[in-house]
Each structure stands twice: as C-alpha cells, then as structure tokens.
Amino acid sequence: YSSAASDVYKRQVVVNPVFDKIRESGFTEYHFEPFTETLKRYGSSHEGVFEMWKQGINAGIFHPQFHGREHLNVKKWLRNLREDVGFTRQAFDLGTFGLTQDVDPNLRRNYMGAFNSALPEDMAYYDNLLREGLDLFEQLFGYRSESFIATTYTWHPNLEKSLKRYGVKYLQGMVVQKIPLDDDTTFTTKKTNYCGWKSAEGLTYVTRNCYYEPSQYKEDWVADCLNRIAIAFFWNKPVVISMHRLNVIGSLDKDNRTTNLASLGTMLHEAVKRWPDVEFMSSDELGWIIES
C-alpha cells in the first residue's frame, strides 16, 4: 500500500438495556431496545440525530460497522444487580452500567466486555447475540456489516465461527488479543494479529496502529498520529486510526466537540499535505483491498 488511511468508519453497538423492564423482572430478565429508540428519550436536543447519521453515511463522511449488540457483559451485570454488588444498583438507578474500579473498588472487572467468557453455554448465547445484533444492524443501516471489533479487544477464537456464519469477513482490533479461558476470571493473550494475517477461521485482521483520543488523555495527538502514519507508510502498511466518538460529542461540553474536531481537521489536512496520494476508506473497504 503506497498510502492508505482507514478512518471514516464508525463502530456501532445497536441496542441499549431497557432499565424499567429489567427492574420489573427483579433483575432476572434482560430486556433491550434499538439505540434509535433510546435516542427518542433524549428530548428535542437530539431530534433528527439518526437522520443526520444517514446523511453522513450517504455523503461518505463515515461508514458504521458492527461492534456488538450491546457494549455490556449482560450475565455478569444481571448477577451483580441481583446480589447488589458495590455501586451497581446505584448506577442502574441512574440509567447506566459504566462503572470502573476507580469508582467502585468492589468490581473485579467492569461490565464493558461483552464477550468475556469461554464457557460453552456462553458461546451459544454469543452466537444468538451476534445473529440478532448483525441482523438489527442491517435493518437500521440498510447493509450488512462485514467487519467487527470485539468490545475491550476480548474474545475467544470460537466466537469467530459465529462471526463467519453471519457474514463477517474482517476482524479489527489491536495486535494483542485478550482471550478468556473461563467466565471472566482468567485470560491469556495472543500477540500476532498482524494486519493482513488471517485467523483460524479465515477472517482477515485489520489492525489499529494509530490513535486519536484527546478527551481521555492530554497529549499532542496530532504529532503522535502523524508520526505513526509516517512509520506505517515507511513500511508500506495501511493506517487504521482508532478514535472514540466521545472525542467529538458536544451535548455536555461544546468545547470538547469544537476543539477536538478542529484538532482532527488539522491532523487530516497535514496528512494530505505530507502524503498527497493518501486515500481514505472504511475498514471493510480496506479489508477488500487486502484480500484482493
């Protein structure tokens, strides 16, 4: 690849928990809704958000791909809700599950890893979860997602059988993959998911190698990204940029959106200036090129 940068995709989970129904079940049943229904409860400030997403997709600004049905370890969350572990109930009452050990020392691990088990019964659950999630993704966006990135970069290789069955061809993530050995207790690591290599199931790795996360860490992200791009292009490799959406959200803090979008623009303009033949594409497009 003389010059290629993949940074116009957006990773998307497609459902959120329905907290009232879960509470009514005594925390024994999991209920969820499409994220488009959740958006409706944000009020007038979020009217038309999904329509704007569609406009962005049609204009080629971004191209959503599948990240999971939900960004949540459902089994662990429900169990801890029933057992009233730590601050889990208090967070639930506020409509969230986003706890960390910094907030709640009682948590051995947060709830964000949706695929943190290797148990056979959980693999069967994940199979159904992936089928539902990928089908709903297609209903919402009008196309099938051919790439996938596991939440928290954690999944068991057996999960790839289900991903392949339901149409996924490309696995995005880091070079290092975290692999569960039991039920969210013991993990090992695989450190060879190099871009262009294939998994045991024949899925192609599209590996992240550049990061833009100014809302989380105060660094010179423009300089860091440009340096990583230069290294990748020197070795004739594509650039896959990781950036969470929180970096450009402005509903709670407008400066967060304004400042970080300007910084992102600076980085992209400088990249085009330094490498005039650079091409921007989505992760599934990059996967197609690698395969061809």
Range-by-range predicted roles:
Residues V13-K21, F66-H71, R208-N209, N236-I249:
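Short loop/turn segments at strand-loop or loop-helix junctions that form parts
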Residues V13-F50, K54-A59, P64-E83, F92-G95:
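Aromatic-lined carbohydrate-binding surfaces of glycoside hydrolases
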Residues Y1-A5, Y9:
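Single conserved hydrophobic/aromatic residue that forms the stacking wall/gate
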Residues K40-S44, I57, R69-F115, E121, ...:
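Active-site-adjacent pocket scaffolds in enzyme catalytic domains
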Residues D20-F27, L72-W77, W155-L159, I179-D182, ...:
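Short catalytic/ligand-binding loop motif for oxyanion handling, primarily in non-cytosolic enzymes
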Residues G48-M52, E132-D135, N158-K161, R165, ...:
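Alpha-helical scaffolding segments of alpha/beta enzyme cores, especially the outer helices
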Residues Q12-F19, F148-A150, S282:
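Extended hydrophobic secondary-structure segments that form protein cores and membrane-embedded regions
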Residues R165-T188, P238-S292:
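C-terminal domain-boundary segment and adjacent tail
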